[in-house]
């Protein structure tokens, strides 16, 4: 155990020495720009003394290790036949010594394979592994643990290494970087190799120097890094030679075969589903040739189409595995206000009868009249299609009614053209004023609620101005009607005398 602890300490000191030398080089560069900075000079002196102490400690540890190995070799030479196990121990220690610090692949407790580095051994069958590409603080190896000075134990935020059986370790697969990989998303680390790895994008690659230019995605900074500081993924690359993968693939193939047989039996007995594509070798990426899947896409700006295309849907397909979903939006019938249901149903029937009578009309004429007839029919069909209110249109109409102003102006003009007003018209004005005040209150709340959303806020403000203008004109008409009624009643009183 003492030799293993010395090996761990030696590895840690090597890492610490590398980091201190890198820090010293950066301090030297800073001193070139500002040689009279007292803080930089003091840090430079402290780094030099720390590097000297670490080198002395490394020299002492290596000397002790070499003396121990020499004693083992001498003891093996002195004992010929009776001590075979002791003769084999140096071979095991040499093998472990060769493996110490080497890269490998190991399976984590989450079931994924990661790239790691052997930092020591726990007994004869277990190795202590650290993550080669740590992407979080919990994956980074604790420096104080390597120095046996960590006071937090199992509650430490950093990793104290993972105990993995030596038999389950796999050889490390080196990534072959090529020019074709430019533009791909990767993981990279800048500065020391023992920092946290970050997401980046490979911007360029030099095959001769084996150096790539990367752009980090978090802060948009760029750097030139070697292949040791780059990784295609935070997980380890798997090869076809892995026995466990072959077994998993066989199990998946057998499971997929059974699923195919079940699905074929299902297809024979039931209608074929159109929700998803059939199993094919064609790529199923984002469908760019289809902008709209259904009429309700007018309200989603094509975002839902892209999401559905990435899942394998095509235009005209119903939602669901067997295509049982609806294709058209839900129709909404807006009934006349302040009327009974009997009146509304009769009004709808009368409208349908009128449309049927219009369809039955025949006209005699030539090519010109037929063309005009077809154009009118197409225009009527388009208007009818647009006039069909769906759920989204109803919501938009309730929030931003576009025809409210026209209806209001027409109703005001009609009342003004009727001539003398009565109390019934005054009641209608009062109802309209109440509705406009309620709408104005809702719009004011909407403006206050959506101050951060510029588009909604501007639309609501514009509509609020229109409602205020309509309210002012309605109040003026109401006042005029009230004055007219009062003057008319006064005139009647005077006529009695």
Swiss-Prot record:
Record's keyword terms, sorted: DNA-binding, Metal-binding, Zinc, Zinc-finger
Comp. bias regions, Basic residues: 357-372
Gene3D superfamilies given in the database record: 2.30.30.1190
UniProt xrefs under SMART domains: G_patch, ZnF_C3H1
PROSITE patterns named in the record: G_PATCH (PS50174), ZF_C3H1 (PS50103)
Biased composition (Basic and acidic residues): 373-387
Biased composition, class Acidic residues, residue ranges: 239-268
One Pfam family it belongs to: G-patch
UniProt-recorded name of the protein: Zinc finger CCCH domain-containing protein 22
Organism the protein comes from: Arabidopsis thaliana
Lineage of the organism: Eukaryota, Viridiplantae, Streptophyta, Embryophyta, Tracheophyta
């Amino acid at each position: 155990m003492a030799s293993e602890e010395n090996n761990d300490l030696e590895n840690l000191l090597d890492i610490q020495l590398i980091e201190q030398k890198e820090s010293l080089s950066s301090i030297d560069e800073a001193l070139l720009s500002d040689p009279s900075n007292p803080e930089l000079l003091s840090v430079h002196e402290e780094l030099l003394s720390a590097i000297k102490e670490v080198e002395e400690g490394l020299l002492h540890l290596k000397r002790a290790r070499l003396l121990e190995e020499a004693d083992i070799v001498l003891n093996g030479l002195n004992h010929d036949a009776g001590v075979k196990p002791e003769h084999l121990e140096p071979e095991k220690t040499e093998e472990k010594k060769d493996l110490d610090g080497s890269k490998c692949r190991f399976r984590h407790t989450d079931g994924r394979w990661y790239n790691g580095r052997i930092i020591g051994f726990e007994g004869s069958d277990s190795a202590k592994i650290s993550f080669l590409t740590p992407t979080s603080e919990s994956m980074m190896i604790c420096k104080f643990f390597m120095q046996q000075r960590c006071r937090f134990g199992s509650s430490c935020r950093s990793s104290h290494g993972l105990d993995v059986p030596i038999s389950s370790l796999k050889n490390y697969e080196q990534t072959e970087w090529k020019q074709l990989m430019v533009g791909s998303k990767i993981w990279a680390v800048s500065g020391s190799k023992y920092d946290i790895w970050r997401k980046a994008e490979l911007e360029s690659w030099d095959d001769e120097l084996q150096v790539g230019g990367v752009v980090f995605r978090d802060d948009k900074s760029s750097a030139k890094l070697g292949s040791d500081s780059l990784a295609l993924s935070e997980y380890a690359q798997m090869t076809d030679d892995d026995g466990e993968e072959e077994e998993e693939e066989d199990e998946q193939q057998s499971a997929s075969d059974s699923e195919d047989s079940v699905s074929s039996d299902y297809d024979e007995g039931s209608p074929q589903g159109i929700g998803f594509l059939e199993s094919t070798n064609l790529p199923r990426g984002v469908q760019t040739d289809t902008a709209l899947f259904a009429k309700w896409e007018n309200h989603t700006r094509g975002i839902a189409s892209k999401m559905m295309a990435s899942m394998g849907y095509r235009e005209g397909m119903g939602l669901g595995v067997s295509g049982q979903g609806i294709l058209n939006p839900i129709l909404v019938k807006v009934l006349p206000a302040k009327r009974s249901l009997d009146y509304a149903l009769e009004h709808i029937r009368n409208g349908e009868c009128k449309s049927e009578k219009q369809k039955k009309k025949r006209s005699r004429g030539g090519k010109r009249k037929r063309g005009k007839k077809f154009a009118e029919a197409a225009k009527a069909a388009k208007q009818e299609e647009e006039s069909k209110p769906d759920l989204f249109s109803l919501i938009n109409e309730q929030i931003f009614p576009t025809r409210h102003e026209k209806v209001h102006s027409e109703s005001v003009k009609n009342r003004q053209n009727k001539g003398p007003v009565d109390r019934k018209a005054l009641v209608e004005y009062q109802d309209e004023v109440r509705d406009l005040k309620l709408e104005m209150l809702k719009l004011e709340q909407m403006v206050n609620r959506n101050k951060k959303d510029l588009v909604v806020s501007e639309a609501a403000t514009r509509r609020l101005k229109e409602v205020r203008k309509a309210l002012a004109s309605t109040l003026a008409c109401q006042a005029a009607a009230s004055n007219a009624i009062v003057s008319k009643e006064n005139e009647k009183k005077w006529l009695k005398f």
